[in-house]
């Protein structure tokens, strides 16, 4: 329940929680609960595309983003910002950050090392 009320407007969450109403995938998309709706036959391809997009990113950055989002989701903005800064500094000081800049300059895909 707590997660739902953080994801969608209060009145919508209350309506769903109090009535037990089921929602369609299209409604979940409208509410911002999910990122995409695809026909069942295209589900595997859509999952592969999402996974590919995430795996194309620097692993340390993905890890830091997940950690910061989990830690700061319920914090006031000022406290959240204080926790984000160390993760940003660590990511910018990584070997992968340097590789990302080099790859951009050389117009090639980066080769992430997770360091």
How should each PLM-predicted stretch be described?
Residues 102-115:
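Terminal low-complexity tails and localization/encapsulation signals of metabolic enzymes
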Residues 16-17, 68, 72, 86-92:
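Helix-loop "lid/cap" segments that line or gate small-molecule binding pockets
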Residues 26, 80-81:
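Short, flexible turn/loop "capping" segments at secondary-structure junctions
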Residues 1-60, 94, 99, 108:
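Crotonase-fold acyl-CoA enzyme core
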Residues 51, 69, 81-88, 101:
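Hydrophobic alpha-helical core bundles mediating ligand binding, dimerization, or RNAP-core interactions
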């Amino acid at each position: 329940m707590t997660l739902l009320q953080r994801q969608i407007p209060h009145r919508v969450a209350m309506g769903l929680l109090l009535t037990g109403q089921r929602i369609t995938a299209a409604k979940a998309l409208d509410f911002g609960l999910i990122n995409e709706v695809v026909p069942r036959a295209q589900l595997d391809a859509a999952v592969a595309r999402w996974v590919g997009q995430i795996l194309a990113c620097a692993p340390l950055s993905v890890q830091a983003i997940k950690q910061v989002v989990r830690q700061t989701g319920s914090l006031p903005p000022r406290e959240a910002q204080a926790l984000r800064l160390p993760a940003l500094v660590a990511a910018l000081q990584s070997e992968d950050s340097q590789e990302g800049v080099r790859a951009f300059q050389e117009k090639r895909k980066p080769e992430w090392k997770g360091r």
